[in-house]
Amino acid sequence: LVAIDIGSSSIKLVQLTEFKEGQYELTRFGMMPLDADCIVEGAIKKPGQVANALKNLIKAEKIQSRYAVSAVAGEAVFIKKIKVPVMSEEELSAKITQEAEQYIPFDIDDVALDFQILGAVNADKEEGSEDSEESESADDSPQDNDEHKEDSHEEGEMMEALLVAVQRDVIDERTNILMEADLKPAIIDLDVFALMNAAQLTTDLSTMGTIALIDLGDSFTHINIIQDGAMGYTRDIPVGGGYLTNMLMSKFQFPFKQTLDIKRGKFSSSMKEEEVIEVIARAYKKVLEEIQKSFEYFSTLSDHKIERVLLCGGGSMIRGVDGFFADYLKVPVEIMDP
């Protein structure tokens, strides 16, 4: 399998080879930049150009495998913990459409549904993650993210399930791009679950308490709060590393490529590192404010505080970004490996 990450500014490609049971070696990695108008605010505007860029990347990296995995995220994705009466997986599978209709903000006929049973819970227990949603706007207070109907089941033994809905046209769009690049789609996952799986390769998330896995993308910052190894809350903030790139270009009057080098810590002799750090801090202030709001919202509803932050995504490569986040959020911050 080859893994394809289609982001706002570039396409990333990774291929792993299992050399021992459960142990993998990175055998291929490549990246192909995309024009700024190819993907806007997470939506693919020029699928033909994206497919051509993917074709060129596959050719450049000499990829032989035709089977691909990819992932989707953003406003087309809905994730929510729900409570339902205790039943078997087969029974819930037969009733999931009826259950989902009272929660999801999309036409039920236009989405692909899935679920995972998380276990029995006290019917009267309030869980903050019940009000979590994948596509909350950064301009909306997290406290407003509670507009869905409350569970209306009669009192009795209840269980918790993770409900996932994805608009079919987004899945079809991603599938078509892979096929246009002469690949065979094997899996279309959700970004949040793909990141959790990647983190789980090197860290036992179930033993880490309550952590935040934060993906610093170019157009979006994705917050994923994981509690004892299970998804607890997700949020998308429509501000990312692209905002920092624009600020650096404006400040230092450098072309795009040189600005990317600056973000990686490659300063020219004419620059003062303190000035770069100041711009980075100002650029991420808005993101950090929104992350802090999300942490407070989750803590208020779940009675759990964030114990650690794991950073990933292109923004995590910015020199010193983990220090900025740790200073502001007052929790330990690490760069995720892998």
Describe each PLM feature range.
Residues 1-99, 133-136, 142, 148, ...:
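Non-catalytic, solvent-exposed interaction/assembly segments
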Residues 1-33, 66-73, 202-233, 237-243, ...:
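Gly/Thr-rich phosphate-binding beta-strand-loop-beta motif of the actin/hexokinase/Hsp70
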Residues 7-10, 64, 74-76, 109, ...:
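Short flexible coil/turn linkers enriched for glycine and charged/polar residues
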Residues 39, 168-197, 230-271:
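Glycine-rich phosphate-binding loop plus the immediately following alpha-helix
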Residues 54-67, 254, 292-308:
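Phosphate/pyrophosphate-binding loops at sites that engage ATP/ADP/AMP, CoA/4′-phosphopantetheine
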Residues 71-201, 308, 338:
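Active-site neighborhood for divalent-cation/phosphate handling
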Residues 261-308, 314-315:
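Adenine-nucleotide phosphate-binding core of ATP-dependent small-molecule kinases
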Residues 323-338:
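Conserved phosphate-binding/catalytic loops in two-lobed NTP-binding clefts
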